Swiss-Prot record:
GO process annotations (BP): 7-methylguanosine mRNA capping; chromatin organization; heterochromatin formation; intracellular mRNA localization; negative regulation of autophagy; negative regulation of transcription elongation by RNA polymerase I; positive regulation of transcription elongation by RNA polymerase I; positive regulation of transcription elongation by RNA polymerase II
Miscellaneous comment in the UniProt entry for this protein: Present with 4490 molecules/cell in log phase SD medium.
Any one GO cellular component localisation term in the record: DSIF complex
Superkingdom: Eukaryota
GO molecular function, one term: protein-containing complex binding
Keywords: Centromere, Chromosome, Metal-binding, mRNA processing, Nucleus, Transcription, Zinc, Zinc-finger
CDD domains assigned: Spt4 (cd07973)
Resulting phenotype, residue 10 to Y: Loss of function
InterPro entries: RPABC4/Spt4, Spt4, Spt4/RpoE2_Znf, Spt4_sf
Protein name per its UniProtKB record: Transcription elongation factor SPT4
Biological role: The SPT4-SPT5 complex mediates both activation and inhibition of transcription elongation, and plays a role in pre-mRNA processing. The complex seems to be important for the stability of the RNA polymerase II elongation machinery on the chromatin template but not for the inherent ability of this machinery to translocate down the gene. Structural and functional component of the centromeric and heterochromatic loci linking chromatin structure with kinetochore function and gene silencing.
Length: 102
């Protein structure tokens, strides 16, 4: 069983322990503002991994909408739905589960 989880908002992949200890390095402020726990906003079910060394210079990072995020491993697709409290704070939110077609 894998202990990795992916953030449903930014897609960063970390261990369960890292999320529990530090929260999401990109999204923790939003989760705190919404009053939800990091674990409610992460999923153990995700597909594909992309390593980002320099997100600000990567076309893949721009495609995944993480070009303003920290370097790390990112999931291409994350299964699950963010709590409504988080979605309400994000007028331009696009789910990472593939449910929204552009």
């Amino acid at each position: 069983m894998s202990s990795e989880r992916a953030c449903m908002l930014c897609g960063i992949v970390q261990t369960t322990n890292e999320f529990n200890r530090d929260g999401c390095p990109n999204c923790q402020g939003i989760f705190e503002e919404a009053g939800v726990s990091t674990m409610e906003c992460t999923s153990p079910s995700f597909e594909g991994l992309v390593g980002m060394c320099k997100p600000t210079k990567s076309w893949v990072a721009k495609w995944l909408s993480v070009d303003h995020s920290i370097a790390g491993m990112y999931a291409i697709k994350v299964d699950g739905r963010l709590p409504a409290e988080v979605v309400e704070l994000l007028p331009h939110y696009k789910p990472r589960d593939g449910s929204q077609v552009e």
